[in-house]
Amino acid sequence: MARRDPEAESKDLNWKEFEAFVESAFLSFGYKTERNARLRKPRAEIDLIATKTGLAFAVDCKHWKRTIGYSGMLAISNRQMVRASRLVGERSMRVIPLVVTLHDESLRILENGVPIVPIHKISDFILNWENSSDDISVLSPQVME
């Protein structure tokens, strides 16, 4: 049986279908999901929230045709960190900010603790993120107070 190539499959998807593709990966591992979650005051949106056992991934899905480099990705991840922090406050649960990209940005975990995961590695990340948990930002209600 041939292995599926998530990157090749994702290239022809539009951004909305890409979000659904990322969501399907989390669903396949038993996560409950919510797409396009809106935050208020100030208004913001999280592409995907994937929740399991008191932990949520706040996922920003980036279906860009090219890579953007370190400084661009750091700016994007910082904004996702802010949205994830707000989610902690609204839902009182631990939250991991995450950026999923179409292409491999050759970055793993940025200095702010936000993982950058190319779509072809999303399943492996979901299964094994705890192996890198010392480097990953896990925002919790106790820390946010």
Question: What are the language-model segments listed below?
Answer:
Residues 1-46, 50-145:
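Intrinsically disordered, low-complexity Ser/Thr/Pro/Gly-rich regulatory segments
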